[in-house]
């Protein structure tokens, strides 16, 4: 935004939140018809980039009938085994295999989006609350449908723990219902808040460091010390992007387990 001082000189101030703004990159205009619904935004562009990266990752895992896989193949296999073991542990029983492809797809998608957002001057898709909460609402609705399809009206037993005294039934049912409906927001909000907070911290500290090092030669030399700390924060943010994708899948598997086994 622009600010004027007393001498009518204009200054341009970059907001740290500008990196999360959705902008039109390509669109059609016509005086007779509104074509804005087919505009290509940075969100749409990074969606296509994410799909392209995921497709490329899967094509690169082709072992071409070799007995010993490449390092890239082994890394993908390690991710696959990690998510499979997590789903098997969380859901268990004989049905975990039905839901593993869904959980794995969510992990790869969120993991790829988070890593792409760590590229300088890129766009953080998972920082948008509307997008991630929409995904969490779809998961919540899907698990609820699975619960009613599997158990019918017995699904309501999920909101009443076994052995609850009669006097506590209204209170506990209210708490369980509130907790269950909160999943529609909490799952996505957790991811969005962590990604947004990390990116804001990096941008703000990076901007302060740039201004410090641009003052004079002394501050330029002194700026290398906080630069090491900022690089450490960037490495931590890389770890958070992976952890958040994994946490999403753990909670998703936990929600599936609750609806399948009613506990």
Curated annotation (Swiss-Prot):
Subunit structure: F-type ATPases have 2 components, CF(1) - the catalytic core - and CF(0) - the membrane proton channel. In yeast, the dimeric form of ATP synthase consists of 18 polypeptides: alpha, beta, gamma, delta, epsilon, 4 (B), 5 (OSCP), 6 (A), 8, 9 (C), d, E (Tim11), f, g, h, i, j and k.
InterPro entries: ATP_synth_F0_asu, ATP_synth_F0_asu_AS, ATP_synth_F0_asu_bact/mt, F0_ATP_A_sf
GO molecular function: proton-transporting ATP synthase activity, rotational mechanism
Name recorded for this polypeptide: ATP synthase subunit a
TM segment ranges: 35-57, 95-117, 129-151, 156-178, 191-213, 228-250
A Gene Ontology term for the protein's cellular component: mitochondrial inner membrane
Topology in membrane: Multi-pass membrane protein
Any one GO biological process: proton motive force-driven ATP synthesis
Source organism of this protein record: Eremothecium gossypii (strain ATCC 10895 / CBS 109.51 / FGSC 9923 / NRRL Y-1056)
Propeptide segment residues: 1-14
Its biological purpose: Mitochondrial membrane ATP synthase (F(1)F(0) ATP synthase or Complex V) produces ATP from ADP in the presence of a proton gradient across the membrane which is generated by electron transport complexes of the respiratory chain. F-type ATPases consist of two structural domains, F(1) - containing the extramembraneous catalytic core and F(0) - containing the membrane proton channel, linked together by a central stalk and a peripheral stalk. During catalysis, ATP synthesis in the catalytic domain of F(1) is coupled via a rotary mechanism of the central stalk subunits to proton translocation.
Domain of life: Eukaryota
Family classification: Belongs to the ATPase A chain family.
Signal peptide range in chain numbering: none
Pfam families on file: ATP-synt_A
Family annotation (CDD domains): ATP-synt_Fo_a_6
Keyword terms, alphabetized: ATP synthesis, CF(0), Hydrogen ion transport, Ion transport, Membrane, Mitochondrion, Mitochondrion inner membrane, Transmembrane, Transmembrane helix, Transport
PANTHER family assigned to the protein according to its UniProt record, in alphabetical order: ATP SYNTHASE SUBUNIT A
Main location: mitochondrion
Subcellular location: Mitochondrion inner membrane
Keyword set includes Transmembrane helix: yes
SUPFAM superfamilies in the record: F1F0 ATP synthase subunit A (SSF81336)
Gene3D superfamilies hit by this protein: ATP synthase, F0 complex, subunit A
């Amino acid at each position: 935004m622009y600010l004027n001082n007393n001498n009518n000189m204009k200054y341009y101030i970059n907001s740290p939140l500008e990196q999360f703004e959705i902008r039109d990159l390509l669109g059609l205009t016509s005086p007779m018809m509104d074509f804005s619904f087919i505009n290509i935004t940075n969100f749409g562009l990074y969606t296509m980039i994410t799909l392209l990266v995921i497709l490329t990752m899967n094509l690169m895992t082709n072992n071409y009938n070799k007995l010993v896989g490449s390092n890239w193949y082994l890394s993908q296999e390690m991710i696959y085994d990690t998510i499979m073991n997590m789903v098997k542990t969380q859901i268990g029983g004989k049905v975990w295999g039905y839901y593993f492809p869904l959980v794995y797809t969510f992990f790869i998608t969120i993991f790829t989006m988070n890593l792409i957002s760590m590229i300088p001057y890129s766009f953080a898709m998972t920082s948008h609350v509307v997008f991630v909460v929409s995904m969490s609402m779809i998961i919540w609705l899907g698990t609820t449908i699975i619960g009613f399809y599997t158990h019918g009206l017995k699904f309501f037993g999920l909101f009443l723990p076994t052995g609850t005294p009669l006097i506590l039934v209204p209170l506990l049912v209210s708490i369980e219902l509130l907790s269950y409906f909160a999943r529609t927001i909490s799952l996505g909000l957790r991811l969005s808040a962590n990604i947004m907070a990390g990116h804001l911290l990096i941008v703000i500290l990076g901007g302060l460091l740039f201004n410090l090092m641009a003052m004079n030669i002394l501050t330029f030399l002194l700026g290398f010390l906080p630069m090491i700390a900022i690089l450490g924060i960037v490495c931590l943010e890389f770890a958070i992007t992976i952890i958040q994708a994994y946490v999403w899948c753990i909670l998703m598997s936990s929600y599936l387990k609750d609806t399948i086994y009613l506990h």
